[in-house]
């Protein structure tokens, strides 16, 4: 199979915001306890954080981490997680039928985020709480001192404010599964008033308002329009969430699911622009795709997990090589929309539908999906370019006619590099690929990294953590994308 990839330096999509390489840690399963935080672990540092996990997070290249939820946040009292640990209450976590010990809270999280070099993105509870609690949390985190909650923070040993810039106004508030779920009118009014107050406390804060939980919600579209009609002047981003799975075992269709993400982004962008015009606003609403991933492997086993325990093994998907190809396609799609998608969070980060897995008290390792994210975060910087691909296509079930090759090119003027990310979806044909970049002169190919495996169901485990591992190909004049492979091709100019 032949493929041609075209891009032009003079026609960028836009700058790639580093926050598109974000992730998510929720108080759910073993994400926090036994993942991020495990004081008795051999690698634990002075704060109880697992050093082996922090090294993997840094290697992954995560730039921002959303916290503490997720569904969890809609029943969370942030005050439970501050001050002396021995005084913190144990609470029922109704979102995940677990016990929350509150041994990790906002102060510990921001300390951990600083250690891994990621910006924190805090969510406030708009399920059981509202304006007052959000105001107080913002004051505790970001006000210098001389007030009740800023001085409370200082009394806890944190003299300087945390300076948390990014905040989520609740989570999936349209969902019937959500604690304190709301109609679009109810949520829109509450989110608008909360946003006003939070920005009065800290004018530098940047706020994300909840979009629909997914495109199958009966109010999808109407929800976005209604919520934005109340909040457009007060918030900076609208959230999108989407997960994909292969329950039917149809690999060809599964590999095309990024087409659904593409249409989702286009639809929500159009709704945002419609509200913008109706309000005669000069502000563009950006998107925060703050939950995206493959999620389906753990659905059945989660039904067997004992309820009302601390850190139960929930949502522990073990990812295949096939899943890594899908994650690669989803990353490419996000980058192709970098003019609107300014924040994105791979959900989640540790143990829970995550690229990083741990044994409580034991080993840690990188799952298959770790590597496409790591490559994009490391190499796809600067500007994304309008990228066109000419290649064969196939019928992908509900996603329709789908090109075999999915690709995006990025250019970084600061170091004069060009990166091409590409997935070959074909089951049996390599793609001999020609890349043409206009407006940049001659290109020199510097590197070709590939992630491939003969077994689509291959996984990495604690005992075999390198079964699916990227490798460098020998450089040659021809660029060949192997059948069912993830590729990173680096050029300089």
Residue positions per predicted region:
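Acidic/histidine-rich catalytic cores and adjacent linkers
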Residues: 304-305
């Amino acid at each position: 199979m032949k493929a041609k990839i075209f891009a032009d330096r003079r026609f960028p999509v836009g700058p790639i915001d580093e926050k598109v390489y974000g992730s998510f840690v929720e108080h759910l399963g073993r994400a926090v306890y036994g993942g991020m935080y495990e004081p008795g672990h051999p690698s634990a540092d002075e704060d109880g954080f697992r050093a082996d996990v922090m090294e993997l997070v840094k290697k992954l290249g995560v730039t921002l981490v959303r916290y503490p939820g997720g569904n969890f946040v809609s029943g969370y009292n942030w005050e439970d997680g501050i001050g002396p640990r021995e005084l913190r209450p144990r609470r029922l976590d109704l979102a995940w039928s677990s016990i929350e010990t509150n041994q990790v809270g906002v102060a510990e999280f921001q300390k951990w985020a600083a250690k891994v070099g990621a910006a924190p993105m805090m969510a406030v509870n708009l399920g059981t709480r509202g304006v007052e609690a959000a105001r107080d949390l913002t004051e505790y985190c970001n006000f210098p001192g001389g007030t009740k909650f800023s001085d409370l923070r200082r009394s806890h040993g944190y003299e300087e404010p945390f300076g948390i810039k990014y905040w989520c106004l609740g989570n999936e508030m349209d969902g019937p599964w959500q604690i304190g779920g709301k109609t679009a009118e109810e949520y829109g009014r509450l989110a608008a008033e909360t946003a006003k107050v939070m920005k009065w406390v800290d004018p530098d804060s940047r706020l994300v308002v909840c979009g629909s939980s997914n495109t199958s919600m009966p109010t999808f579209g109407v929800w976005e329009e209604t919520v934005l009609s109340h909040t457009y002047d007060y918030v900076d981003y609208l959230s999108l969430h989407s997960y994909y799975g292969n329950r039917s075992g149809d690999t060809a269709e599964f590999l095309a699911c990024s087409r659904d993400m593409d249409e989702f982004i286009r639809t929500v962008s159009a709704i945002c622009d419609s509200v913008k015009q109706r309000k005669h606003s000069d502000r563009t609403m950006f998107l925060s795709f703050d939950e995206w991933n493959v999620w389906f492997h753990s659905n059945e086993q989660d039904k067997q997990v004992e309820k009302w325990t601390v850190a139960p093994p929930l949502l522990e998907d073990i990812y295949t090589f096939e899943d890594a190809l899908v994650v690669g396609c989803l990353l490419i799609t996000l980058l192709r929309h970098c003019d609107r998608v300014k924040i994105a969070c791979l959900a989640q980060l540790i143990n829970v539908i995550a690229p990083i897995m741990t044994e409580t008290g034991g080993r840690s390792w990188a799952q298959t999906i770790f590597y496409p994210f790591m490559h994009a975060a490391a190499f796809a910087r600067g500007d994304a370019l309008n990228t066109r691909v000419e290649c064969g296509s196939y019928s992908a079930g509900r996603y329709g006619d789908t090109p075999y090759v999915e690709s995006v090119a990025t250019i970084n003027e600061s170091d004069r590099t060009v990166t091409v990310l590409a997935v070959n979806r074909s089951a049996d044909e390599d793609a001999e690929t020609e890349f043409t970049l206009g407006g940049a002169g001659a290109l020199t190919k510097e590197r070709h990294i590939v992630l491939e495996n003969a077994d689509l169901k291959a996984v990495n485990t604690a005992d075999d953590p390198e079964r699916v591992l990227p490798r460098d190909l020998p450089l040659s004049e021809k660029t060949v994308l192997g059948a069912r492979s993830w590729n990173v091709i680096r050029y300089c100019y």
